[in-house]
């Protein structure tokens, strides 16, 4: 800038020095040599000014060039950012399209599942009706078979007996196939339901809004009948001094495990097995250990009790109810699997009367294995010949009397005693097992169910 000002100052001087000689001659003739020297000095000054101006312009150009380069770099960065933003926007649009397609697919699958569920329920109802009809036919055929065997002409009618047996087996196989089909359809429905829930969960995360084995075993056989557990009731005059449960027996100084007679309040006296191995008294209500006792019993026997107190037994629902009406009790389950690992779980519980099908309501309080009994749910007891209204055919399919949930297959400590790897898969499902929700199934080798008052 200073150079430019100097240049503007020098230029007029140079111009003034170049005045026409004819005009300057009017002043004085002898001054001509002095004017020439003045013009040379002015030219030098002008040249110097121009040189400085050139350097100044050069510096200005360099600075301007640097600023322009900075501007271009910023423009390039902006262009790259805009390009990246455009790519990301396109990706988001593609993801949105994909999610919308997924949502449409989900809606279609949901409709398919609903239709399948309706169809499955219809098939299940028809299968159950058909099964009931087949059971009536089988019972009628069994009666005919019994009459044929007992009749004097039974030996002569052997071909007819063989034919009846063959027909019964065919009907049994038909029931097995039908129930297996229902089981497979239930599994498919459960898998699709889980897939739908997973997709819905993903959709909720993106902000765009739009099962245990439920298997039914195949075979329903009539169980052999075992005599009810003997009460060994004592005379009324002797019952007043009897303890109310095994805790009362223990408090009287009897610290050895064994069979004792107790008399709960408002009940007759009966024998129980008191277990003191853990250092505290427990009243056993069920024991499984070797399969010597068949537990696929009738409702009447499950109410009265069956088996041997020094072996495998079920104490009886009536006696269990009489015990637990006296106080608040803890239900303890001790389980041993086929790897000889020992587990236990304890529940606080409430047991209903005969009128409620001995409804069980539990809440887990302790244990080293997850509980498989549904908590805070009414579980009604049922057997193959006594089923609460609305329940599935769990006892017929899985064997034994138990507190069943809305679905079968979660747990059953009164099932058929099966050794591992000796039976087919349907038979294993009818065995003794414990399956916490969404976890592995424990095949049980031995089990104990026992009671102890909380106070």
From Swiss-Prot:
Kindly state a single biological-process term from the GO annotations of this entry. Answer: phospholipid catabolic process
What are the glycosylated positions? Answer: 115, 226, 232, 296, 357
InterPro entries on file: Fibrinogen-like_C, Fibrinogen_a/b/g_C_1, Fibrinogen_a/b/g_C_dom, Fibrinogen_C-term_domain
Where are the coiled-coil regions? 85-206
The UniProt PTM text for this protein says: In part proteolytically cleaved by proprotein convertases; proposed to be involved in activation. In primary hepatocytes is intracellularily predominantly processed by FURIN and extracellularily by FURIN and PCSK6/PACE4. In 18.5 dpc embryos 75% of protein is found to be processed compared to 25 % in adults.
Q: What is the reported phenotype of gene knockout?
A: Low plasma levels of triglyceride, HDL cholesterol and HDL phospholipids, and non-esterified fatty acids (NEFA). Animals fed on high-fat, high-calorie (HFC) diet show reduced epididymal adipose tissue weight with no difference in adipocyte size. Hypotriglyceridemia with elevated postheparin plasma LPL activity is specifically observed in the fed state. Mice deficient in both Angptl3 and Angptl4 show an additive effect on plasma triglycerides and did not survive past 2 months of age.
Region annotation (Sufficient to inhibit LPL lipase activity) ranges: 17-165
What happens on changing residue 221 to A? Abolishes proteolytical cleavage
Name of this chain's protein:
Angiopoietin-related protein 3
User: What is the scientific name of the source organism?
Assistant: Mus musculus (Mouse)
Q: Source organism lineage? A: Eukaryota, Metazoa, Chordata, Craniata, Vertebrata
């Amino acid at each position: 800038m200073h150079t430019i000002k100097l240049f503007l100052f020098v230029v007029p001087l140079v111009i003034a020095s170049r005045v026409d000689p004819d005009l300057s001659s009017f002043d004085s003739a002898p001054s001509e040599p002095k004017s020439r020297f003045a013009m040379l000095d002015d030219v030098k000054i002008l040249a110097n000014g121009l040189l400085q101006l050139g350097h100044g312009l050069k510096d200005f150009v360099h600075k301007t060039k640097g600023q322009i380069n900075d501007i271009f770099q910023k423009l390039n960065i902006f262009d790259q950012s805009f390009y990246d933003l455009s790519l990301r926007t396109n990706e988001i649009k593609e993801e949105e399209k994909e999610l919308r397609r997924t949502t449409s697919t989900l809606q279609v699958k949901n409709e398919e599942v609903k239709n399948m569920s309706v169809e499955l329920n219809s098939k299940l109802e028809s299968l159950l009706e058909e099964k009931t009809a087949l059971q009536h036919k089988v019972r009628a055929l069994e009666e005919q078979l019994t009459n044929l065997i007992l009749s004097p002409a039974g030996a002569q009618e052997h071909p007819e007996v063989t034919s009846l047996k063959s027909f019964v087996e065919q009907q049994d196989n038909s029931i097995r196939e039908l129930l297996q089909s229902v089981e497979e359809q239930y599994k498919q429905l459960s898998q699709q339901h889980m897939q739908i829930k997973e997709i819905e969960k993903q959709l909720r995360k993106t902000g765009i809004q739009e099962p245990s084995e439920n298997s039914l075993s195949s075979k329903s056989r009539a169980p052999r009948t075992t005599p009810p557990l003997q009460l060994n009731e004592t005379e009324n005059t002797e019952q007043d001094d009897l303890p109310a449960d095994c805790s009362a027996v223990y408090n009287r100084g009897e610290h050895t495990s064994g069979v004792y007679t107790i008399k709960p309040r408002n009940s007759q006296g009966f024998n129980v097995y008191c277990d003191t191995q853990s250092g505290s008294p427990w009243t056993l209500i069920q024991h499984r250990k070797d399969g010597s006792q068949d537990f696929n019993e009738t409702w009447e026997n499950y109410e009265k009790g069956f088996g041997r107190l020094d072996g495998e037994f079920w104490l009886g629902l009536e006696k269990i109810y009489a015990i637990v009406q006296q106080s608040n009790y803890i239900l303890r389950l001790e389980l041993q699997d086929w790897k000889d690992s020992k587990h236990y779980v304890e529940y606080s519980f409430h047991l209903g009367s005969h009128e409620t099908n001995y409804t069980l309501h539990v809440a887990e309080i302790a244990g080293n294995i997850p509980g498989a009994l549904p908590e805070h749910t009414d579980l009604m007891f049922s057997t193959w010949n006594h089923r609460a209204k609305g329940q599935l055919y769990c006892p017929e399919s899985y064997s034994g009397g138990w507190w069943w949930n809305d679905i079968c297959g979660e747990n059953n400590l009164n099932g058929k005693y099966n050794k591992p790897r000796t039976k087919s898969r349907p038979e294993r499902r009818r065995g003794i097992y414990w399956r916490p929700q969404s976890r592995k199934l424990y095949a049980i080798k031995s089990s104990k169910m026992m009671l102890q008052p909380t106070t």
